[in-house]
Amino acid sequence: MKLVRFLMKLSHETVTIELKNGTQIHGTITGVDVAMNTHLKSVRMTIKNRDPVHLETLSIRGNNIRYFILPDSLPLETLLIDDTPKSKTKKKDSGRVGNRGRGRGARGRGGPRGRGRGRASGRR
């Protein structure tokens, strides 16, 4: 399972996030998108060497996140189960084999010319 898919399942969980600049953010996840952009509510943001600031909501760009600190009570076994539907691969007909060698109609060096621009074949 991809990390982002796991994080997308963490809605309504309270986590601590550390950013690359050292800022720590504690809040409840409202959503995570495929770019790992994270949206939080009831946020306490502690910028390095400053007093904490309380915010109602906060959105964090995914590439600024260093790591997530998850609560110990989180049921990781159930969250890590990959429940995304698998795409079915199309089966080819067993009697017919395609795309083997150049065969008729091959393009490129030495292949048949095709219809072209109306040059007379054999005349010069």
Swiss-Prot record:
<protein>
    <recommendedName>
        <fullName>Probable small nuclear ribonucleoprotein Sm D1</fullName>
    </recommendedName>
</protein>
<keyword id="KW-0677">Repeat</keyword>
<feature type="repeat" description="1">
    <location>
        <begin position="100"/>
        <end position="101"/>
    </location>
</feature>
<dbReference type="GO" id="GO:0097526">
    <property type="term" value="C:spliceosomal tri-snRNP complex"/>
</dbReference>
<feature type="region of interest" description="9 X 2 AA approximate tandem repeats of R-G">
    <location>
        <begin position="100"/>
        <end position="118"/>
    </location>
</feature>
<dbReference type="InterPro" id="IPR001163">
    <property type="entry name" value="Sm_dom_euk/arc"/>
</dbReference>
<feature type="repeat" description="9">
    <location>
        <begin position="117"/>
        <end position="118"/>
    </location>
</feature>
<comment type="function">
    <text>Plays a role in pre-mRNA splicing as a core component of the spliceosomal U1, U2, U4 and U5 small nuclear ribonucleoproteins (snRNPs), the building blocks of the spliceosome.</text>
</comment>
<keyword id="KW-0507">mRNA processing</keyword>
<dbReference type="GO" id="GO:0005682">
    <property type="term" value="C:U5 snRNP"/>
</dbReference>
<dbReference type="GO" id="GO:0005681">
    <property type="term" value="C:spliceosomal complex"/>
</dbReference>
<dbReference type="InterPro" id="IPR010920">
    <property type="entry name" value="LSM_dom_sf"/>
</dbReference>
<dbReference type="GO" id="GO:0030532">
    <property type="term" value="C:small nuclear ribonucleoprotein complex"/>
</dbReference>
<keyword id="KW-0747">Spliceosome</keyword>
<dbReference type="GO" id="GO:0005687">
    <property type="term" value="C:U4 snRNP"/>
</dbReference>
<dbReference type="InterPro" id="IPR027141">
    <property type="entry name" value="LSm4/Sm_D1/D3"/>
</dbReference>
<dbReference type="GO" id="GO:0071011">
    <property type="term" value="C:precatalytic spliceosome"/>
</dbReference>
<dbReference type="GO" id="GO:0000243">
    <property type="term" value="C:commitment complex"/>
</dbReference>
<dbReference type="GO" id="GO:0003723">
    <property type="term" value="F:RNA binding"/>
</dbReference>
<feature type="region of interest" description="Disordered">
    <location>
        <begin position="81"/>
        <end position="124"/>
    </location>
</feature>
<dbReference type="GO" id="GO:0000398">
    <property type="term" value="P:mRNA splicing, via spliceosome"/>
</dbReference>
<keyword id="KW-0963">Cytoplasm</keyword>
<dbReference type="InterPro" id="IPR034102">
    <property type="entry name" value="Sm_D1"/>
</dbReference>
<dbReference type="GO" id="GO:0005829">
    <property type="term" value="C:cytosol"/>
</dbReference>
<feature type="domain" description="Sm">
    <location>
        <begin position="2"/>
        <end position="74"/>
    </location>
</feature>
<comment type="similarity">
    <text>Belongs to the snRNP core protein family.</text>
</comment>
<feature type="compositionally biased region" description="Basic residues">
    <location>
        <begin position="87"/>
        <end position="124"/>
    </location>
</feature>
<dbReference type="GO" id="GO:0071013">
    <property type="term" value="C:catalytic step 2 spliceosome"/>
</dbReference>
<feature type="repeat" description="7">
    <location>
        <begin position="113"/>
        <end position="114"/>
    </location>
</feature>
<dbReference type="GO" id="GO:0005634">
    <property type="term" value="C:nucleus"/>
</dbReference>
<feature type="repeat" description="8">
    <location>
        <begin position="115"/>
        <end position="116"/>
    </location>
</feature>
<feature type="repeat" description="6; approximate">
    <location>
        <begin position="111"/>
        <end position="112"/>
    </location>
</feature>
<keyword id="KW-0687">Ribonucleoprotein</keyword>
<dbReference type="GO" id="GO:0034719">
    <property type="term" value="C:SMN-Sm protein complex"/>
</dbReference>
<feature type="repeat" description="5">
    <location>
        <begin position="109"/>
        <end position="110"/>
    </location>
</feature>
<dbReference type="GO" id="GO:0005685">
    <property type="term" value="C:U1 snRNP"/>
</dbReference>
<keyword id="KW-0508">mRNA splicing</keyword>
<dbReference type="Pfam" id="PF01423">
    <property type="entry name" value="LSM"/>
</dbReference>
<feature type="repeat" description="4">
    <location>
        <begin position="107"/>
        <end position="108"/>
    </location>
</feature>
<dbReference type="InterPro" id="IPR047575">
    <property type="entry name" value="Sm"/>
</dbReference>
<feature type="repeat" description="2">
    <location>
        <begin position="102"/>
        <end position="103"/>
    </location>
</feature>
<dbReference type="GO" id="GO:0005686">
    <property type="term" value="C:U2 snRNP"/>
</dbReference>
